[in-house]
Amino acid sequence: MINSKLKNRNLNQVNVFNFSELFKLMKPRVMSLVIFTCAVGLLMAPSTVSTKDAMIAILLVSIGAGAAGALNMWYESDLDALMTRTCLRPIPMGKVNKNQALIFGTSLSFFSVIALDYFANTISAVLLLFTILFYVFVYTIWLKRKTPQNIVIGGAAGALPPVIGWTIATNSLSLEPITFFLIIFFWTPSHFWALSLYKSDDYKKAKIPMLPLTNGIESTKINILVYSLLMLPMVILPYAIDFVGLVFLVPALMLTLYYNILCFELYKFKINKFNPKKAKTIFGYSILYLFLIFVIFLIDKIL
């Protein structure tokens, strides 16, 4: 049970910047995924940049993503205090106040975009700015509390880091990096809806309109299965445009088919009921799945 004292903390009493807690606002685990996918996008590009410039640029992209995360926690601190999964975050715990989070997130946003324009190129900086603005204003402020399609549309922000990695190296956009975007974009719904199934009580407390609460369990299971099946054409697309070879296609299809099987097993459970263990398995596997897909991209290029 969430300690009711969390709701009554006077956050204005936090007057000193606690940098370890500010770092937590940046969602380090999300940042690590951003660093990885951005690096893959950069390494898959036909053009190259120096190792130093590449590392600086990727770091700046991760800082931009962290800034968006901090602004997300600033705006959603009221919801975070209500949910078991998020109640120990810095703002609900009273370790950082909302003004500090706002200043921190805004400052890092400006810094990361301006610095990326200087160290990389304008296209990459514009894409990073769009990512931050989309995540904060479209997903966090507009969609999150209004529609169960929040993560479908909002997933666009999380799908852009590998595209930015590509533009850092090439200073241009083409069809190839769009395949990275589509893979992450269509992966996102099944990943988060699996989480929302076994954490539905949390979302209910916070009155967040996730699909299990608005459309029911059965509809959620169907949507998870449908989006997992949509991953099949998404992993075939890079091969179809001659971006990758069979070294990518074969294992990517195998990983995706196993994902489909897991989602089908979740779907075929009793009507309007679900197996919590299976939902957790899908959520966990989806993270491993995305990581392996991007690893295979690199292996295909090396071989």
UniProtKB/Swiss-Prot annotation:
<protein>
    <recommendedName>
        <fullName>Protoheme IX farnesyltransferase</fullName>
        <ecNumber>2.5.1.141</ecNumber>
    </recommendedName>
</protein>
<keyword id="KW-0997">Cell inner membrane</keyword>
<feature type="transmembrane region" description="Helical">
    <location>
        <begin position="30"/>
        <end position="50"/>
    </location>
</feature>
<comment type="function">
    <text>Converts heme B (protoheme IX) to heme O by substitution of the vinyl group on carbon 2 of heme B porphyrin ring with a hydroxyethyl farnesyl side group.</text>
</comment>
<feature type="transmembrane region" description="Helical">
    <location>
        <begin position="279"/>
        <end position="299"/>
    </location>
</feature>
<feature type="transmembrane region" description="Helical">
    <location>
        <begin position="123"/>
        <end position="143"/>
    </location>
</feature>
<feature type="transmembrane region" description="Helical">
    <location>
        <begin position="178"/>
        <end position="198"/>
    </location>
</feature>
<dbReference type="Pfam" id="PF01040">
    <property type="entry name" value="UbiA"/>
</dbReference>
<keyword id="KW-0350">Heme biosynthesis</keyword>
<keyword id="KW-1133">Transmembrane helix</keyword>
<feature type="transmembrane region" description="Helical">
    <location>
        <begin position="101"/>
        <end position="121"/>
    </location>
</feature>
<keyword id="KW-0812">Transmembrane</keyword>
<keyword id="KW-0472">Membrane</keyword>
<dbReference type="InterPro" id="IPR006369">
    <property type="entry name" value="Protohaem_IX_farnesylTrfase"/>
</dbReference>
<keyword id="KW-1003">Cell membrane</keyword>
<dbReference type="InterPro" id="IPR030470">
    <property type="entry name" value="UbiA_prenylTrfase_CS"/>
</dbReference>
<feature type="transmembrane region" description="Helical">
    <location>
        <begin position="54"/>
        <end position="74"/>
    </location>
</feature>
<dbReference type="GO" id="GO:0008495">
    <property type="term" value="F:protoheme IX farnesyltransferase activity"/>
</dbReference>
<comment type="pathway">
    <text>Porphyrin-containing compound metabolism; heme O biosynthesis; heme O from protoheme: step 1/1.</text>
</comment>
<dbReference type="InterPro" id="IPR044878">
    <property type="entry name" value="UbiA_sf"/>
</dbReference>
<dbReference type="GO" id="GO:0005886">
    <property type="term" value="C:plasma membrane"/>
</dbReference>
<feature type="transmembrane region" description="Helical">
    <location>
        <begin position="245"/>
        <end position="262"/>
    </location>
</feature>
<feature type="transmembrane region" description="Helical">
    <location>
        <begin position="219"/>
        <end position="241"/>
    </location>
</feature>
<dbReference type="InterPro" id="IPR000537">
    <property type="entry name" value="UbiA_prenyltransferase"/>
</dbReference>
<dbReference type="GO" id="GO:0048034">
    <property type="term" value="P:heme O biosynthetic process"/>
</dbReference>
<keyword id="KW-0808">Transferase</keyword>
<comment type="similarity">
    <text>Belongs to the UbiA prenyltransferase family. Protoheme IX farnesyltransferase subfamily.</text>
</comment>
<feature type="transmembrane region" description="Helical">
    <location>
        <begin position="150"/>
        <end position="170"/>
    </location>
</feature>
